[in-house]
């Protein structure tokens, strides 16, 4: 008796050669429905429609096709169980040996920012998950394929003989993972649409890559990624495989460069070009200029030692002039919206340099959550991507600031929230001069930033991610010649810092918003 394969797929990659091999080399009969059946018929592959097999028509505009006892009985019946086989024979139902199903493209559908409610709902598959779960449950008797990537390996095993129980069990596991991911994606989307809250289930993202190791060689690591968003859409043009640390640093780099309009630097010569250098997820240099190579060199001036082995992010296409500057350094990665051909040719001499193309649309469509594991659980929070606009800032000091000072303060404020707390940034004229990161006390971070800036701190501004618990940072800033400070405010000792500014001739802004980063 011929074996039966039930095939119903949304993703038709590899379908025709796979089905031809099943029928011509292995004698399978194929049952299929809808668009899959049409595709097989057009390729002259013998196929029986589900409607012909069940004797029941597709109804409700195709919502009900495979939900029928002749389908699910054939999938769920144990082939070694006499009672099950008796029931099949009595109802004239045949055993189904192979189920090939992948689901309506719900994740792809909702990745469109303009998707309608009705379109999203219509792309929730019902019959597909039911068949997948039925076949996976009865995997001792049925093989279940849910991904075109499985076709070739399955045919190789079929050519070598029967599909082993071990292989069927592995396919069943992958099938349940497939439906679990699908259901989580639906739950997450509906949670946001209906209640504007997080789904209780965190990720529907598949493993994109098993990484060589985690932060250290003794740690295992996997990269989970949405196919149609963010880094899942990034294109690596050159270089070694991305590591865990590369990805962490790239994320920090892009989060920082977005402050200055990712891809905005391509909008014309009048637009600011921005460059960010990251080391261990901290900015070690940030600058803006009307010239990209100048922006990079200004960023590099902030801390050229820490830039060694760092990651560079740019807010516009990398040109040849800037590529020449980059090629003189040892860097792990460069990320930009795109690359000029001459720039790629220059960087091609740096064989290990990872060159990443990340489009503006990839960033725009990406939904980000900040996720950290704790003992027995996971913490999930919104990403800190909201800034208080300058017109909402308050100036509690007697001395006000110039337009130029406000521009420098806004620049420093955009940088400091991407520096690990406690964080201090000293800046002037669109360039970071000193960055104090990750200190256990604020005055310690200020000392690092001010000492790094040195004489350049004279006439510069200082930004702090948190309030000043004491007035010591104001006094230290004054000694280095800082003329204006921006900080959240909110300390019970705010007045002490205000009085110190008034006494020492500094202006200060309270933004009213803290930006801790742990």
Curated annotation (Swiss-Prot):
Disulfide bond entries: none
Chain ranges passing through the membrane: none
Pfam families: AICARFT_IMPCHas (PF01808), MGS (PF02142)
Enzyme Commission number, as recorded: 2.1.2.3, 3.5.4.10
Keywords noted in UniProt: Hydrolase, Multifunctional enzyme, Purine biosynthesis, Transferase
One of the record's GO molecular function terms: IMP cyclohydrolase activity
Gene Ontology BP, a term: 'de novo' IMP biosynthetic process
Domain of life: Bacteria
One GO cellular component term: cytosol
Pathway: Purine metabolism; IMP biosynthesis via de novo pathway; 5-formamido-1-(5-phospho-D-ribosyl)imidazole-4-carboxamide from 5-amino-1-(5-phospho-D-ribosyl)imidazole-4-carboxamide (10-formyl THF route): step 1/1; Purine metabolism; IMP biosynthesis via de novo pathway; IMP from 5-formamido-1-(5-phospho-D-ribosyl)imidazole-4-carboxamide: step 1/1
Domain MGS-like: 1-146
InterPro entries noted in UniProt: AICAR_Tfase_dup_dom_sf (IPR024051), Cytidine_deaminase-like (IPR016193), MGS-like_dom (IPR011607), MGS-like_dom_sf (IPR036914), PurH-like (IPR002695)
SUPFAM superfamilies, alphabetized: Cytidine deaminase-like, Methylglyoxal synthase-like
Catalytic activity, as annotated: (6R)-10-formyltetrahydrofolate + 5-amino-1-(5-phospho-beta-D-ribosyl)imidazole-4-carboxamide = 5-formamido-1-(5-phospho-D-ribosyl)imidazole-4-carboxamide + (6S)-5,6,7,8-tetrahydrofolate; IMP + H2O = 5-formamido-1-(5-phospho-D-ribosyl)imidazole-4-carboxamide
Record family assignment: Belongs to the PurH family.
Domain notes per entry: The IMP cyclohydrolase activity resides in the N-terminal region.
PANTHER family membership: BIFUNCTIONAL PURINE BIOSYNTHESIS PROTEIN ATIC (PTHR11692:SF0), BIFUNCTIONAL PURINE BIOSYNTHESIS PROTEIN PURH (PTHR11692)
Entry protein name: Bifunctional purine biosynthesis protein PurH
